């Protein structure tokens, strides 16, 4: 009788444990939500920039595997990004001047409570940059503005821990470039930022948000990149949806072919959020 009772108890505990652990391949939602104002995030949309320029993002990030318990979640996934610089011309023409590619893998872990969560995201990625035919001036048979194509690539590991309370999330980050060309680019990037989704004025249709991201990096000398965005999101606050936003950027260009060029611009855009 005692042996039978132990067997029943063991089976019950096994059932409870298995019910508390959920494993899923290719889940619908990302485990770690993209950091809203961070430039290097999966985006699918476009932004009209001041100065008759346009940024076009065609990017995705997918978790391959996710393991969840009652209040934790671990995931492994992959990233494929392209972000391009276009020039606005008459007759609705937008020649593509420059394009950057990113691909890599990521892992994420978070702990969930009633109103808050904390965790981290780890990424291992490669970026390369190229001029495109829209940068070439057929009239003079040369690249426009005296620019020349140059080799730009970097392989890096990025670590971003974060903490969220209700709609407010703060994060810090460190990126180490273990291989980079050109050599005058520093190997360390320090990052700090936040995003705030104002659920307390959620209309049931959309929610307003603001976000800011700062990166300190070195290209010959230390300099900072500032990225600010504010807008409204339709859909799930912490999931899929569509966003309309104003953004402002100042700092060294995000396009690799212009990596040492300082830029400052405003933009209005739309993005399909993962």
Language-model region placement:
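Outer-membrane pore/translocation modules
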Residues: 73-191, 261-262
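Solvent-exposed loop/turn segments connecting transmembrane beta-strands
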Residues: 48-55, 70, 114-115, 179-188, ...
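Short loop/turn motifs that connect adjacent beta-strands in outer-membrane beta-barrel proteins
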Residues: 21, 26, 65-76, 112-118, ...
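Membrane-embedded beta-strands of outer-membrane beta-barrel proteins
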Residues: 58-60, 105-107, 159, 192-194, ...
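Residue-level signature of outer-membrane beta-barrel architecture
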Residues: 62-64, 109-111, 159-165, 176, ...
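Outer-membrane beta-barrel "beta-signal"
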Residues: 263-274
């Amino acid at each position: 009788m005692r042996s039978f009772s132990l067997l029943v108890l063991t089976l019950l505990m096994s059932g409870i444990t298995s019910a508390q652990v959920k494993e899923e391949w290719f889940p619908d939602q990302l485990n770690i939500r993209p950091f809203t104002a961070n430039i290097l995030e999966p985006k699918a949309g476009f932004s009209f920039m001041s100065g008759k320029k346009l940024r076009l993002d065609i990017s995705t990030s997918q978790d391959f595997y996710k393991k969840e318990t009652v209040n934790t979640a671990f995931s492994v996934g992959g990233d494929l990004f392209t972000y391009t610089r276009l020039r606005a011309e008459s007759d609705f023409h937008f020649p593509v001047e420059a394009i950057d590619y990113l691909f890599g893998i990521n892992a994420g872990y978070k702990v969930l409570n009633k109103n808050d969560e904390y965790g981290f995201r780890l990424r291992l990625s490669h970026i390369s940059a190229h001029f495109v035919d829209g940068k070439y001036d057929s009239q003079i048979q040369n690249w426009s503005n005296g620019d020349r194509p140059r080799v730009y690539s970097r392989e890096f590991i990025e670590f971003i821990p974060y903490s969220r309370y209700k709609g407010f999330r703060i994060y810090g980050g460190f990126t180490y470039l273990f291989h980079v060309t050109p050599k005058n680019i520093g190997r360390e990037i320090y990052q700090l930022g936040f995003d705030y989704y104002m659920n307390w004025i959620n209309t049931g249709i959309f929610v307003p948000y603001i976000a800011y991201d700062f990166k300190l990096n070195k290209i010959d000398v230390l300099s900072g990149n500032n990225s600010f965005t504010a807008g409204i999101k339709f859909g799930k606050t912490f999931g899929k949806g569509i966003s309309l936003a104003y953004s402002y950027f100042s700092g060294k260009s995000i396009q690799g072919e212009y990596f040492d060029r300082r830029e400052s611009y405003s933009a209005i855009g739309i993005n399909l959020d993962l």
